[in-house]
């Protein structure tokens, strides 16, 4: 049998109804989950936009590297092809930057501002917990004197303890009432707050990918050679690769 120590300074009287405590824990638990979800979403959105920018910047660098390749100086068709690619990559990068800026302004920043509210909320909960501990301590003190023989000194101390208890009880009840009223309102406000951000995110993605469809459609028309299917190009590449492999400098020993 395990030993359970007495709780020093704990009142016998149930000063906070269990239903009230359950309601408080439920509402605060929902806000703790919302805080974590907000933090994670902000982090993931930042990682996503950083990856988008890195992708388009890399694509531009690749096209510039191809333009500086000596092969482009020797073949006008190849130069035209790579120039078209470079133009497309720069257009893509420009639209990508616009998209990222829009997401930063209308999604990431609102997420950051929303998340900045939680430290104040958590501090209010801590103040409520401290008020509850003070309430329990003084209630236990009152109960201790109530159980003693009612002598003059004891009655004086009991009166003093009750006077000390009254403002502490009122302070806790006010803090508890305020949190129970405002936590559900705060949680319910998340939909109205975030809906414009998510609509902006969707619009930014739609605009970006619509522009990408145009850019790569134009690029495809510039690069297409009449009468050449993907299968034909693949066969031609394989034939050229076979010719290269036949050279003595790359032949297997």
Curated annotation (Swiss-Prot):
Annotated Gene Ontology cellular component terms: actin cytoskeleton; cytoplasm
Domain of life: Eukaryota
Subcellular location: Cytoplasm, Cytoskeleton
GO molecular function, one term: cytoskeletal anchor activity
Region feature Disordered, mapped onto this chain: 220-240
Family annotation (SUPFAM superfamilies): BAR/IMD domain-like
GO biological process, one term: plasma membrane tubulation
Segments forming a coiled coil: 18-51, 120-152, 231-247
UniProt feature, compositional bias: Basic and acidic residues: 227-240
Span of domain BAR: 9-232
Tissue: Ubiquitously expressed except in brain.
Alphabetically ordered keywords of this record: Cell cycle, Cell division, Coiled coil, Cytoplasm, Cytoskeleton, Septation
PANTHER family: BRIDGING INTEGRATOR 3
Task of the protein: Involved in cytokinesis and septation where it has a role in the localization of F-actin.
Protein name: Bridging integrator 3
Species of origin: Homo sapiens (Human)
Gene assigned in the entry: BIN3
